[in-house]
């Protein structure tokens, strides 16, 4: 067992019990009002929800209010009909996107993403289809790598590639793992949407960021100091010991402890 701050009083079963309680505390509809997951909840059509979810997750770094506001701007720029916009847009429809900016994600990146999404729906059976085609039983990280290759089969600027992380290149791929959690987990708790039925939640990886990483280290379930792909594999292994069928539910506990409780 890992050496940890709480080891003297908390074994793995006690830790699981503690984190299970925190999952129940944070994995409920109250979580949505301050989280970007609210963006895909605005839509009922699967394709609409998965498109805006992907875009919202892509810009999910920085201030959460700013993320949510800018994601809503993206929805407005797509005429509040994202799937229709992606599939039927002409070049001149992309011009209003030019002034969009969130941190380093700009209007040119946004336009490229629209074109890439159309390519995926036309030629690769949609977003779920790409990930399902390349999934492995115990990990979606190789599927993320393949998704990035497919996504950038269209003409694009090299700078735009940085907005889709690649775990096989060492990234923890926090934002895309968060997006996959939204799309795949379906526990009827009202937060994650569970729209994708062809991929098991058992294959998901935790969206590892500064909050979840720091809490995991304090709990002794993560030793590596960098938040990278190796740290993610280490954390995933520990979370699967507590629940192999739904390991990423513990993201709610780790994130909630870090953000809301200052753990």
Q: What is each PLM-predicted segment?
A:
Residues 2-263:
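HhH-family (HhH-GPD) DNA N-glycosylase catalytic core used in base-excision repair
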